[in-house]
Design a protein with these regions (language model features):
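Short, conserved phosphate/pyrophosphate- and ester-handling motifs at nucleotide-, phospho-/glycolipid
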Residues: 44
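Short, well-ordered alpha-helical segments enriched in acidic and aromatic residues
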Residues: 18-31
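A beta-strand edge to alpha-helix "cap/lid" segment located at domain peripheries
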Residues: 1-11, 33-35, 39, 47-119
Length: 119
């Protein structure tokens, strides 16, 4: 099951980088809980969709350096560039996803600015 969860996450990530929010959301449960540690939580696809519309005006650019799977969980570690007003800001991240019935049900995202690398 872990390999299937990894494949689903990779499919969802590909949709995000292509700007395909609906393709990403198709990999999620309707009652998804998306928590960015230190910022708050979104509940449900409608809330995630709205957040993406507001915050992913340009698709984020990210590189997954490691996927670690254990049972119903997959952790993705990597780097992320978020473009705001035409300026790419480098970040480091770790997303911990919980899967249910083959789809993403919960995210705990740890995202921090990374001034040690260039965008």
């Amino acid at each position: 099951m872990s390999d299937q969860h990894k494949a689903t996450l990779q499919q969802a990530n590909a949709a995000i980088t292509a700007g395909d929010h609906e393709g990403f959301l198709a990999c999620c449960h309707d009652d998804i809980v998306w928590t960015t540690v230190g910022e708050g939580s979104l509940r449900g696809k409608a809330a995630v969709r709205q957040w993406m519309r507001e915050n992913y005006l340009e698709p984020p650019r990210f590189t997954v350096t490691r996927l670690i799977a254990d049972g119903e969980h997959v952790a993705a570690l990597g780097t992320l560039e978020i473009v705001t007003d035409g300026v790419a800001m480098p970040h480091a991240y770790c997303d911990v996803w919980r899967f249910r019935d083959g789809r993403m049900a919960e995210l705990r995202a740890f995202v921090i600015p990374d001034s040690t690398r260039d965008a």
